[in-house]
Swiss-Prot record:
Full protein name: NAD(P)H-quinone oxidoreductase chain 4 1
Compartments, record wording: Cellular thylakoid membrane
Single biological process term from Gene Ontology: ATP synthesis coupled electron transport
Function recorded in the entry: NDH-1 shuttles electrons from NAD(P)H, via FMN and iron-sulfur (Fe-S) centers, to quinones in the respiratory chain. The immediate electron acceptor for the enzyme in this species is believed to be plastoquinone. Couples the redox reaction to proton translocation (for every two electrons transferred, four hydrogen ions are translocated across the cytoplasmic membrane), and thus conserves the redox energy in a proton gradient.
Amino acid sequence: MSTFPWLTTIILFPIVAALAIPFIPDPTGKGRPIRWYALAVGLIDFALIVYAFTNFYDLNTPGMQLWESYDWIPEIGLRWSVGADGLSMPLILLTGFITTLAILAAWPVTLKPRLFYFLMLAMYGGQIAVFAVQDMLVFFLAWELELIPVYLLLAIWGGHKRQYAATKFILYTAGSSLFILVAGLAMAFYGDTVSFDMQTLAAKDYALGFQLLVYAGFLVAYGVKLPIVPLHTWLPDAHGEATAPVHMLLAGILLKMGGYALIRMNVDMLPAAHAKFAPVLVILGVVNIIYAALTSYAQRNLKRKIAYSSISHIGFVLIGIASFTNLGMSGAVLQMVSHGLIGASLFFLVGATYDRTHTLILEEMGGVGQKMKKIFAMFTACSLASLALPGMSGFVAELMVFIGFATSDAYSLPFRVIVVFLAAVGVILTPIYLLSMLREIFYGPENKELVEHEALVDAEPREVFIIACLLVPIIGIGLYPKLLTQIYDATTGQVIARAREVLPTLAQQTEQPLGILPMVAPQLKANAQ
């Protein structure tokens, strides 16, 4: 055990380091020293995360570790409380890893480099804070902090419709954040004790009706960030206009904040309401998988195609969260990490392809594989990971969710069969739209004007290095999932145990959770008996 404030240092270091960027000399005005400085800050902070994890984190302890708690504004009961458990630690590691690679991916950025890297580093600290803080009010502040850098990164460095995409992003995400504030305040002031501490909030005995209202508010807020259909429409627009490093942060980290908060607050703090809403999450998960897969197939814009593919894979996170099994929940967390790695790699390659072809329309591409053999090979490998090829992380995550839900005793057999069948249809659709995408980009029909253009060059060493760094954990987790699952199994097991405690009680209280899915009620009633 260490008394050093590791998490506070990890959160504040990139933010404080960003404040020094205006004072870094840049004789050429192209940002070269600023790039190296930002990369050094990213590497140092990631090294601190890895050091704290390897030396002071116990894999067998389900509760909070690396705990710190200090009075901040005692007049309103606000404390700076941070900690990491099995749910937050994998995502903190993912944040450090993806952000450092995103800084390296931003090497070609020459427009306002000081502001760009300042925002990247500020976002770095804000995202880690979301996963680490254990005070509801500070969580809300951290959640809001990361919105500002993303908005500016879209609005200044985005594509032709960047203002529209940035405005839509801020309206959706900032508007939905109000639900977090209202629901969090309601929990804090419920009962005789007023507290923003998450552990205190989780221990309160809330009335079922109150839980349902708060759960619904959180679900809207986190459903926008995940995103869940129909709250997803901001994401294709944001991805459609973002640059490659911003893509990596959006797909790799930002969306995971929604999944993390859904487990942390909806499942762990409001288990009775979760048992009621779980069938709804399952249905929303299936809708995500099928709808987004079909929409992805219909897209002719490469960025939007990958964006909808990303939304489709989020459906497995929802099904795993609602499975009420250790295996299903473990698969959901694994899918979040896998989705972050694969999504970041695909969007980086989309950006690399666009930098050379200057088009995102599939009909305008064709035959570029003969000039870009390395990019073709990397794009193929990452697409195979996305379609859940055995031996890669996506396969293990989706298989765990399938088995976890199929063996769940919280749902009737007919309902489980229907859900598994529909989810399997989504799995079948994935290779259809991804492999056809690869064919249209790299095989043909050949666009001779594009293929013969001198700007159409293959990947440089920096780009190969970034994809290699992403493929190593994708393949490593796919071959040996315990590399990741051992970090969070103790915590997710505790979360599921708490969620399952209320199933018999709810079965006695009602025959039809939320008045829907009568097929779910008989199994819940059987559990009660």
